[in-house]
Amino acid sequence: MLNHAQIRKFYDAFGQKQDKQFYEAAALQSLIHHGGFATARSVVEFGCGTGRLAATLLAEYVPDTCQYTGMDISQTMIELCKKNTEKFKDRVTCIQSDGSPKLPMQDQSADRFIATYVLDLLSEDDAQTLMDEAHRVLLPGGLILLACLTYGTTPVSRLVQSLWSGLYALSPKIVGGCRPISLAPLVNPGIWQTVYSQTIISYGVPSEVLVARKTTS
C-alpha cells in the first residue's frame, strides 16, 4: 500500500492523465444520476483530482447557488481543479490536504459528500475514518456518493480484477495504489441508509457505485 508521500508523488506526476481513466465514466454518470444534485446546496469532494467531476456538476447539475469544496493530496491536482472550475470560482474552494482522512469542515455543513476512486486507495482504517468524517460533515438526510474499483461479477470482469490485483501485489505503484474493494462493509446500517448500490462494468473493469443517506446525527 502506498503511503501519503508516495500517493502525493504519484498523482503530482500523473496530473491531467487522470482524465483518461476511460473506465470511470459510466460509474460517475450513474453516481450523478442517483445523487439528487438538483437540490444540493453544499458539495464536498474528497479526492477531487483534476476537477472534471466538479466542473460537470457545477455546469449542468447543481443549482447556481450551490457551493463546492474539493480536497486532494496532490498540489498538481489542486491546481488543475482550480483551472477547470475557474468559471465558477466564486462558488469553489480547493484545499490541498496532507492525506489525512480528517476533514477541515464544521459539523453538518454539507448535504452531498463525494469520494470517487479514493477509498480503494486508502487503508481500511483511513477509509473507515473518512466514512465517519463524512457522516459528521453531512446534514441529516445528506447523501454520501461513492465509487471505487471492486470485484468482478462476470468472467471478463473477474479476469480483469484478478490481473489488477496481481499487479497491485507486485507493486501498488503500477496501478496508482488502487485495488479492488467492497464498499458495503464500510456503510454502517445504523447511521446510513443505502439508497443505491450497483456494480458497473466498463471495458471489463468493475466499479462499485453506492449512494447512502445519513439517517442519524
Predicted features by range, described:
Residues 103-113:
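A short acidic, Gly/Pro-enriched loop at the edge of an enzyme's catalytic core
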Residues 112-125:
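A short SAM/SAH-binding and catalytic strip from SAM-dependent methyltransferases
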Residues 147-190:
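C-terminal alpha-helical "lid/dimerization" subdomain adjacent to the S-adenosyl-L-methionine
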Residues 1-38, 52, 56:
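Conserved class I S-adenosyl-L-methionine
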Residues 128-140:
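A short glycine-rich, Lys/Arg-flanked "PGG" loop and its adjoining helix->strand segment in the class I
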Residues 199-217:
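Core SAM-dependent methyltransferase catalytic element
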Residues 44-101:
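Class I SAM-dependent methyltransferase SAM/SAH-binding core
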Residues 42, 141-143:
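Short glycine-centered segments of the SAM/dcSAM-binding site in methyltransferase folds
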